[in-house]
């Protein structure tokens, strides 16, 4: 019996635990759901709830009419948002394996950002800190998410351009970033790994020669760039 219950846990056959919450980390019924939402006590993934504001869904003029936002402006706005959040997560909390943003319209998914860290400790640290921070004038609501495999959480029909439910689909409609930004963000991480490897090799050679000093001043430029970037973000009023 125990093996059977374990095999159906989080599936449609499970009458106790909510399969949607298990797969997606969100459920349209919320606290009114008749099945249990088992919130994880540890996870690599965090959810930042309703943090992304799609200007195509919210832009209105003073007279209440919807303002047109071009696709180019939309992509630029989204890429800027994605880069800002991704960079903040990596610089403050730890290495990010992947980050995804929901483009759904349902209340339980709209604007949700899912950040999967390489280490569970970094995810836990991020949740604790982010719940005391604000973004774009709003308090951040962060929580650990059960989602670790986004292939199970995504709407396959949407990826093929065939979803008939539109923005109110209960599976994730993930908004893509531009190819250029993807190369920049994830390529930067690969360069960082190579740089760390070379740095370890240099330290090893230095120890072999029995010398320890001389290389401590090279990080000033990077620290200055980090300070400038932090000041720029403060002026922008987002994080």
Swiss-Prot record:
<feature type="compositionally biased region" description="Gly residues">
    <location>
        <begin position="212"/>
        <end position="221"/>
    </location>
</feature>
<feature type="modified residue" description="N6-methyllysine">
    <location>
        <position position="39"/>
    </location>
</feature>
<feature type="region of interest" description="Disordered">
    <location>
        <begin position="183"/>
        <end position="239"/>
    </location>
</feature>
<dbReference type="GO" id="GO:0089701">
    <property type="term" value="C:U2AF complex"/>
</dbReference>
<dbReference type="Pfam" id="PF00076">
    <property type="entry name" value="RRM_1"/>
</dbReference>
<dbReference type="GO" id="GO:0016607">
    <property type="term" value="C:nuclear speck"/>
</dbReference>
<keyword id="KW-0862">Zinc</keyword>
<comment type="similarity">
    <text>Belongs to the splicing factor SR family.</text>
</comment>
<keyword id="KW-0479">Metal-binding</keyword>
<protein>
    <recommendedName>
        <fullName>Splicing factor U2AF 35 kDa subunit</fullName>
    </recommendedName>
</protein>
<dbReference type="GO" id="GO:0071013">
    <property type="term" value="C:catalytic step 2 spliceosome"/>
</dbReference>
<dbReference type="InterPro" id="IPR035979">
    <property type="entry name" value="RBD_domain_sf"/>
</dbReference>
<feature type="compositionally biased region" description="Basic residues">
    <location>
        <begin position="188"/>
        <end position="208"/>
    </location>
</feature>
<feature type="zinc finger region" description="C3H1-type 1">
    <location>
        <begin position="12"/>
        <end position="40"/>
    </location>
</feature>
<dbReference type="InterPro" id="IPR003954">
    <property type="entry name" value="RRM_dom_euk"/>
</dbReference>
<dbReference type="InterPro" id="IPR009145">
    <property type="entry name" value="U2AF_small"/>
</dbReference>
<dbReference type="GO" id="GO:0003723">
    <property type="term" value="F:RNA binding"/>
</dbReference>
<keyword id="KW-0863">Zinc-finger</keyword>
<dbReference type="InterPro" id="IPR000571">
    <property type="entry name" value="Znf_CCCH"/>
</dbReference>
<feature type="modified residue" description="Phosphoserine">
    <location>
        <position position="61"/>
    </location>
</feature>
<keyword id="KW-0488">Methylation</keyword>
<dbReference type="GO" id="GO:0008270">
    <property type="term" value="F:zinc ion binding"/>
</dbReference>
<keyword id="KW-0694">RNA-binding</keyword>
<keyword id="KW-0507">mRNA processing</keyword>
<keyword id="KW-0597">Phosphoprotein</keyword>
<keyword id="KW-0677">Repeat</keyword>
<feature type="zinc finger region" description="C3H1-type 2">
    <location>
        <begin position="149"/>
        <end position="176"/>
    </location>
</feature>
<dbReference type="GO" id="GO:0000398">
    <property type="term" value="P:mRNA splicing, via spliceosome"/>
</dbReference>
<feature type="domain" description="RRM">
    <location>
        <begin position="65"/>
        <end position="147"/>
    </location>
</feature>
<feature type="modified residue" description="Phosphoserine">
    <location>
        <position position="145"/>
    </location>
</feature>
<feature type="modified residue" description="N-acetylalanine">
    <location>
        <position position="2"/>
    </location>
</feature>
<comment type="function">
    <text>Plays a critical role in both constitutive and enhancer-dependent splicing by mediating protein-protein interactions and protein-RNA interactions required for accurate 3'-splice site selection. Recruits U2 snRNP to the branch point. Directly mediates interactions between U2AF2 and proteins bound to the enhancers and thus may function as a bridge between U2AF2 and the enhancer complex to recruit it to the adjacent intron.</text>
</comment>
<keyword id="KW-0007">Acetylation</keyword>
<keyword id="KW-0508">mRNA splicing</keyword>
<dbReference type="Pfam" id="PF00642">
    <property type="entry name" value="zf-CCCH"/>
</dbReference>
<comment type="subunit">
    <text>Identified in the spliceosome C complex. Heterodimer with U2AF2. Interacts (via RS domain) with PHF5A (via N-terminus). Interacts with ZRANB2. Interacts with SDE2. Interacts with SF3B1.</text>
</comment>
<feature type="modified residue" description="Omega-N-methylarginine">
    <location>
        <position position="165"/>
    </location>
</feature>
<keyword id="KW-0747">Spliceosome</keyword>
<dbReference type="InterPro" id="IPR000504">
    <property type="entry name" value="RRM_dom"/>
</dbReference>
<keyword id="KW-0539">Nucleus</keyword>
<dbReference type="InterPro" id="IPR012677">
    <property type="entry name" value="Nucleotide-bd_a/b_plait_sf"/>
</dbReference>
<feature type="compositionally biased region" description="Basic and acidic residues">
    <location>
        <begin position="222"/>
        <end position="239"/>
    </location>
</feature>
């Amino acid at each position: 019996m125990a093996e059977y219950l374990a095999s159906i846990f989080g599936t449609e056959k499970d009458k106790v635990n909510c399969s949607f919450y298990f797969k997606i980390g969100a459920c349209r019924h919320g606290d009114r759901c008749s099945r249990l939402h088992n919130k994880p006590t540890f996870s690599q993934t965090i959810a930042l709830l309703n943090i992304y504001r799609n200007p195509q869904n919210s832009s209105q003029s003073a007279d209440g009419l919807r303002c047109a936002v071009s696709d180019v402006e939309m992509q630029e706005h989204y890429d800027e948002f994605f880069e800002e959040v991704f960079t903040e997560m990596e610089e403050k909390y730890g290495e990010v394996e992947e980050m995804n943003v929901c483009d759904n319209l349902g209340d339980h998914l709209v604007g949700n950002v899912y950040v999967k860290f390489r280490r569970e400790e970094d995810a836990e640290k991020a949740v604790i800190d982010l719940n005391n921070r604000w973004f774009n004038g709003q308090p951040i609501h962060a929580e650990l998410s059960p989602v670790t495999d986004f292939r199970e959480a995504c709407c396959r029909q949407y990826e093929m351009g065939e979803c008939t439910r539109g923005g109110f689909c209960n599976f994730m409609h993930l908004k893509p970033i531009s190819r250029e930004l993807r190369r920049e963000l994830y390529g930067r991480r690969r360069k960082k790994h190579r740089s760390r490897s070379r740095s370890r090799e240099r330290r090893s050679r230095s120890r072999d020669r029995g010398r320890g000093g001389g290389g401590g001043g090279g990080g000033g430029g990077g620290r200055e760039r980090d300070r400038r970037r932090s000041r720029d973000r403060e002026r922008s009023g987002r994080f």
